[in-house]
């Protein structure tokens, strides 16, 4: 291999090492004998994925608590166990979009499965939205969903989302007054 190609290859490797996580293949002439493919290249670490999860959940929590504050209601606390139940429900909604679980049980049993001890509970589900903002807007425009978000009895909340093949999400908010 000549020096020019070696330098080019070294530069490409350095760029790939320090490039953003999401990048698209450049539309350039490919040297003879090399192949390329157009598309998205993603190499997210477990830490990056966890950060993404925390980021959208924090955005959802901020949005919920802003609505509650505007209504004069105390803020909710994000709870890991309630969140586990919400994520379970989001995955289930991807299979069967309903407040009844695929096993025929009520959605509240997801809280039981996650080890949550509660005296009050509620669930909001939403399908095909792509952002927290559009999902919250949809819920706030619905009397029943808005009532769950603003219910004074709830003290804890958890969120789940599951992505479908089209890139849209099934979103779940689970609310609880824990014992």
Q: Where do the PLM segments sit?
A:
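C-terminal segment of classical bacterial N-terminal signal peptides
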Residues: 16-24
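Bacterial N-terminal signal peptides that target proteins for export
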Residues: 1-8
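Surface-exposed patches in mature extracellular/periplasmic domains of secreted proteins
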Residues: 48, 70-84, 97-109, 146-162
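A short alpha-helix/helix-coil micro-patch that ends at or immediately precedes a cysteine
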Residues: 35-95
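Short, surface-exposed glycine/acidic/tryptophan-bearing loops
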Residues: 30, 84-133, 149
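Disulfide-stabilized extracellular recognition modules
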Residues: 5, 26, 31, 127-179
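Hydrophobic helical h-region of N-terminal Sec-dependent signal peptides
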Residues: 9-16
């Amino acid at each position: 291999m000549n020096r020019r190609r070696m330098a080019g290859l070294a530069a490409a490797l350095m760029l790939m090492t320090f490039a953003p996580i999401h990048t698209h293949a450049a539309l350039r002439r490919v040297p003879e004998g090399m192949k390329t493919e157009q598309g998205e290249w993603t190499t997210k670490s477990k830490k990056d994925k966890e950060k993404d999860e925390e980021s959208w959940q924090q955005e959802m929590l901020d949005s919920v608590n802003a609505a509650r504050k505007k209504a004069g209601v105390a803020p909710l606390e994000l709870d890991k166990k309630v969140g586990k139940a919400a994520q379970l429900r989001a995955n289930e909604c991807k299979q069967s979009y309903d407040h009844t679980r695929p096993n025929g049980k009520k959605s509240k049993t997801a809280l039981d499965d996650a080890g949550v001890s509660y005296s009050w509970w509620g669930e909001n589900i939403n399908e095909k939205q792509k952002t927290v903002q559009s999902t919250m807007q949809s819920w706030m425009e619905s009397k029943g969903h808005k009532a769950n978000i603003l219910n004074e009895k709830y003290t804890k909340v958890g969120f789940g989302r599951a992505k479908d093949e089209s890139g849209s999400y099934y979103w779940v908010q689970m609310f609880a007054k824990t014992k």
